[in-house]
A protein has these predicted regions:
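Aromatic-lined substrate-binding rim segments of carbohydrate-active enzymes
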Residues: 69-138, 210-226
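Active-site groove signature of glycoside hydrolases
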Residues: 120-124, 132-201, 222-234
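Glycoside hydrolase catalytic-domain groove-lining segments
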Residues: 243-244, 248-338
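Aromatic-rich peripheral "rim/lid" segments of glycoside hydrolase catalytic domains that contact
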Residues: 339, 344-348, 359-433, 675, ...
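Surface-exposed, glycine/proline- and aromatic-rich loop segments on solvent-exposed faces
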Residues: 434-568, 623, 627-651
């Protein structure tokens, strides 16, 4: 008896005692729409407006499932109040999520819908996880040997599950291997519910088999079907670029939902799912001649006015099935990733999201999900990942990481309120925070999960005067001079407050993190062949590497001939962004003039400053580790410090410096939630 119980609830083993029972479909993919059968049995169109959610909270990795039942219930309430009607989860969640989803929907007049995703890398893993997921949404799954112990999935949320999305962001190399080097993969498939089209790739054949198996399993065990599709994105979509452009864009595989054909038995139908992000401007000009000819009727009057330069219109026209955007987003982080894309405030983030969501609907897509619901601290961005401890970045908020700022909800430092609000008000400061006093000017210091806060107070502290503040972070390098100033200690940074538009943080050239990591990719010169002196005296701008958006015309390839690879590499090198430039503004969310990117603000005879930890080369501020010497360690390694030093000068001469004690907070992460300005902008367009 126990063995049967285990097999039934844990291993997806079942006996079909109702082989002749009808299979129903409450949700269908019909034409270009998703429909939902109402209480009168009528299929009505359903336009999905939602957010992507993952179980991410500060102090935990996503797979730790740090969010609990109360968190999910609160978030679902916020999402419902925003005007959304759906949630997309890219993978199986924890029992608390499904219990919260069930509880919310059974106690609210307007339930939320769920688009459920699953991830896997091959046929076997996808087949297994899809069966598990199907049992979970029907409340018929117990995982006896999960990483967190036993997991009970007993809440039946299947009435609100719109469909399934197979896969995450597929690795193009995996697709290539399966298409060309995996002899075990069949090159065609004819199933009960799905078949592969003539000319389908082996990877598409694998997906047809997976989708067929999942539909068969739910049809036989639960007597229900629902739409199913697989995830794609601009790097792996069906578009084929001419070789010269494909090389630059690194686009060498294609996945086409049209190559997976539903049978008449698949009553629920299929859909195309895309994660949207900027890929390249004028992409239609880079297509192969054959594809340009095949798509000519679509391309002729393509609407290029939207956010993705015609991509939305192209996909809507091309596909014979509903199209859903499972994720699109814009970061409100302090630092960008690409040329010509400066950082966005929360308001600008909301305006970009609202504009894109509206355009997606106007072009006839069946749904759009904003990615993501909450900021995700454990995410790392390519141009800053090298600079922090890869095992502990969930314990602090890296304002310099764009990927951490995509949410509509922020996690703010402090259990209830921020320790410091950058607004020119001294209410959060007292003598306990005083760290330095010189020539009538006082420096106060505090820190949080986000960065170091300073208040400079005294006569002459105003936008008209220039203040120089040397900061000594590491004992391993630095300089004691700058122009006519002589610092008491070898300093690694120089904070120059020079009005509202020219204030900035400079770094000692030897301690410039981006130089040692990306200089070769920017200039072709290995920085370790041009090592700055140990006690380098030059301060330089703090830069951040950016991706180039330049696409070299195919004609240039022919002109350059055999040398094209190196020449093109030269033209497409990484660019740089002066991330040390500070933004003047009010950083108090309660202010009508709130600027989420604000770094400093002048008050009466004072200025408040926020310096993000990574801007000061902290490797892990939770335990107060800073970067060690790059050229002695051959890269970034952490070294603990118990204090850093700071001083101030208005005029030439010697600059005494005093310590700022540092203790860190370890794993004790205290945060509170805050709905961003972008949330309320989305609420305005979705609540109509």
């Amino acid at each position: 008896m126990l063995g049967a119980f285990y097999a039934h609830f844990s291993r997806s083993v079942f006996i079909d005692f109702r082989p002749n029972a009808p299979v129903t479909a409450v949700f269908r993919a019909e034409g270009d729409a998703i429909t939902h059968q109402n209480s009168d049995g009528i299929d009505v169109p359903l336009v999905l407006r939602g957010v992507e959610m993952i179980p991410s909270v500060p102090g935990n990795m996503a797979w730790d499932f740090g969010a609990d039942l109360d968190d999910y219930l609160r978030w679902l309430g916020y999402i419902d109040a925003m005007g959304a009607n759906a949630i997309y989860v890219p993978n199986i969640m924890d029992p608390d999520f499904y219990n919260a989803f069930y509880q919310f929907n059974t106690t609210n007049e307007n339930p939320l819908f769920l688009l459920q995703g699953v991830d896997g890398h091959d046929y076997d893993s996808l087949t297994s996880v899809l069966r598990e997921m199907i049992d979970i949404i029907h409340g018929r799954r117990i995982n006896f040997f999960s990483r967190t112990g036993m997991e009970f999935f007993l809440s039946d949320i299947s009435p609100w599950v719109v469909g399934f999305v197979v896969g995450a962001d597929w690795d193009p190399d995996t697709i290539t291997f399966m298409n060309h080097f995996d002899p075990a993969m069949p090159d065609s498939f004819q199933g009960e519910f799905f078949s592969s089209a003539e000319g389908a790739s082996r990877f598409e054949v694998m997906l047809a088999r997976v989708m067929d198996g999942a539909t068969a399993y739910e049809s036989r065990r639960y007597k229900v079907q629902r739409p199913i599709g697989f995830l794609s994105n601009p790097t792996i979509d069906f578009l084929e670029y001419a070789p010269a452009y494909a090389t630059q864009l690194r686009k060498y595989v294609q996945l086409n939902p049209e190559n997976i054909i539903p049978s008449e038995s698949m009553d629920a139908g299929t859909f195309a799912a895309y994660r949207l992000f900027y890929f390249t401007d004028d992409f239609t000009n880079y297509l192969t001649p054959g594809q340009q000819e095949a798509l000519a009727p679509i391309l002729e009057d393509l609407d290029r006015s939207c956010m993705y330069n015609g991509y939305l219109d192209l996909l809507a026209r091309y596909h014979s099935m509903p199209v859903i955007a499972t994720g699109f987003g814009f970061s409100s982080g302090r630092a960008p990733q690409r040329m010509d894309e400066p950082p966005l405030t929360e308001r600008e983030q909301g305006e970009a999201l609202a504009g894109t969501a509206t355009q997606i609907e106007e072009r006839g897509w069946a749904g759009a999900f904003i990615s993501t619901w909450q900021d995700t601290w454990e995410r790392r961005t390519w141009n800053t990942a090298f600079s922090s401890d890869p095992w502990r970045y969930q314990y602090w908020h890296n304002l310099q990481s764009a990927d951490q700022g995509y949410g509509l909800m922020a996690f703010e430092p402090g259990a209830d309120v921020r320790p410091v609000l950058i607004d020119g008000n001294a209410d959060e400061w007292n003598d306990y925070h005083l760290v330095h006093e010189y020539d009538g000017i006082r420096i106060y210091a505090q820190y949080s999960l986000q960065g170091l806060y300073l208040m400079i107070r005294g006569e002459g502290v105003n936008p008209e005067n220039t203040l120089y503040l040397p900061i000594d972070v590491t004992p391993r390098s630095g300089t004691s001079v700058f122009e006519n100033l002589a610092f008491e200690r070898h300093s690694d940074f120089l904070l120059i407050l020079s009005g509202e538009d020219e204030s900035r943080l400079l770094v000692n050239r030897r301690y410039h993190a981006t130089y040692q990591r990306f200089y070769e990719e920017m200039t072709g010169i290995n920085p370790f062949t041009r090592i700055p002196p140990k006690w380098e005296s030059e301060f330089v701008p703090i830069t951040l590497a950016l991706q180039s958006t330049l696409i070299v015309d195919a004609d240039i390839f022919e002109y350059l001939g055999p040398a094209f690879a190196e020449e093109v590499r030269e033209m497409r090198r990484l660019r740089s962004w002066d991330t040390g430039m500070l933004t003047h503004g009010i950083g108090n969310p309660a202010s009508p003039y709130f600027n989420s990117l604000a770094d400093f603000y002048f008050g009466e005879n004072l200025v408040e400053i926020r310096l993000p930890w990574m801007l000061l080369n902290f490797f892990d501020p939770s335990i107060m580790q800073v970067h060690d010497d790059y050229y002695e360690r051959f890269g970034v390694e952490g070294i603990r410090v118990q204090e850093i030093y700071i001083g101030i000068a208005i005029e030439d001469g010697g600059v005494p410096m005093s310590p700022i004690p540092l203790r860190g907070w370890g794993n004790n992460v205290q945060v509170h939630e805050r709905l961003k300005q972008s949330y309320f902008i989305i609420q305005e367009i979705w609540s109509d």
